[in-house]
Amino acid sequence: MSRIFSGIQPSGELHIGNYLGAVKNWVQLQETHPGALFCVVDYHAITGTYDPAVLRARRWGMAKSLLAAGIDPAKAALFVQSDVPEHTELSWIFTTLTPLGDLERQTQFKDKSSKVESIPAGLLMYPVLQSADILLYRADSVPVGEDQIQHLELARDTARKWNAKFGQEYFPEPKPLLTPTRRIMGLDGQSKMSKSLGNTIGLMETDDEIWAKLRPAMTDPQRVRKTDVGRPEVCNIFQLHKAFSREETVAQVDGQCRSAGWGCMDCKKVLQESMVQELTPIRGRAEALDAEPQRVLDALAGGAETARGIARETMREVRGYMGLDAVTVDRKSTRLNSSHEFVSRMPSSA
């Protein structure tokens, strides 16, 4: 059975970058891929310095935002990574198969490690945990952006290595499902949209707050005057139109920009109207969840139960193939208790 898994870090409430780059696609995929699993990956959020209270609030904000954006607990499992301890168990197993050099060559590791004096081991092992996140559920498809392809290749390589070492075709080699929306640039037009850079628009922001951020946003740098013809293909605002506006509106914006019929402010005002139309229902659902927080807790609890069921079965089978079958002690009789399968593998006495 085909299975989809994807995760997102708990950065708090969603912004339009991760909404367009991932979550909007998840909402569509849950309709075509029953049983999809979507995870708030909080273990990935602790590779650097963090405040526990802030992390707790961000996990909640992300879960609420995902539900408000359209993730349906009746169609997909939404859960928090740390609620399923098997993630870290499988991650440790995979570290025994992963060459150090493969991790040091990861682009994101080289970029992030160059910005810190002391490099935490967790930063290096980040893609190993990511491989475990995916393979724990034996997912064969992973919706990702282009910046995650290298990490997914490591997961595919890990699956091949484990299968070869233990003589089993157990783990699938997950394939990428590239997000239809191209990489979303920040409002400054210089880098990827990111909360840490302050170049985002939050999904829960009001109509006025959206306009306040769109007004100074970067457009075509060569269009200095309103009478100058524009180049929509290099304008970040036009890319947002393609994500939020109707096709006929996008075509109108393209023509008005190229002919200098509209100025950039005209274009931005139309974009704001398109964004408000799509985001207002999401804000409304988020407000309803704020009023009934138990709905968020129930969704996460149900998702975690589903995820744990799959994860436990995977780890039971993985341990068996690896010779790590569980051994327990029956305290009442003080005798060794184990499965018949384990006993049958014990070496006979000389």
Regions found by a protein language model. Give the residues of each.
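Conserved nucleotide- and phosphate/pyrophosphate-binding catalytic cores
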Residues: 16, 150, 156-335
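N-terminal Rossmann-like or analogous alpha/beta NTP/dinucleotide-binding catalytic cores
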Residues: 2-132, 283, 287
